[in-house]
């Protein structure tokens, strides 16, 4: 089971939409999730190391380099509305086949 963090600038609209896409992608790929949390970038940056994977808009991916150095997979999404992109990123991160 993995712990997923989804972050956007304000932690409201975009991260909630991304959370729904990631939940659907995990379900479709059979990835078991223990926790999925959405939040603002500032909260996400400080909490990222407590998660296995972080999803954020691609232009904010560089904010999570410290967590990435500690083994957290960082998935930057180009299209936050895309189920297929969320699935592809989960596969690239090694959580699904």
Q: Where do the model's predicted regions map?
A:
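Conserved active-site segments centered on acidic
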Residues: 2-41
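Glycine/Thr-rich phosphate-binding loops of Rossmann-like dinucleotide-binding domains
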Residues: 14, 63-64
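Structural signal for conserved beta-strand scaffold positions within catalytic alpha/beta enzyme cores
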Residues: 38, 56, 76-77
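Short, polar loop motifs at secondary-structure junctions
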Residues: 41, 58-62
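A short, aliphatic-rich alpha-helical micro-motif
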Residues: 47-49
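Conserved acidic residues
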Residues: 52
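Short, structured coil segments at secondary-structure junctions
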Residues: 68-70
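Ser/Thr/Gly-rich flexible loops in soluble cytosolic domains mediating phosphotransfer, phosphorylation
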Residues: 73-97
């Amino acid at each position: 089971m993995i712990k997923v963090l989804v972050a956007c600038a304000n932690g409201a609209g975009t991260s909630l939409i991304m959370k729904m896409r990631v939940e659907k992608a995990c379900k479709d790929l059979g990835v078991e999730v223990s926790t999925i949390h959405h939040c603002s970038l500032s909260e996400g940056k400080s909490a990222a190391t407590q998660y296995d994977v972080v999803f954020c808009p691609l232009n904010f991916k560089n904010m999570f380099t410290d967590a990435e150095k500690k083994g957290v997979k960082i998935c930057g999404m180009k299209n936050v509305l895309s189920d297929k992109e969320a699935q592809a990123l989960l596969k690239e991160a090694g959580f699904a086949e």
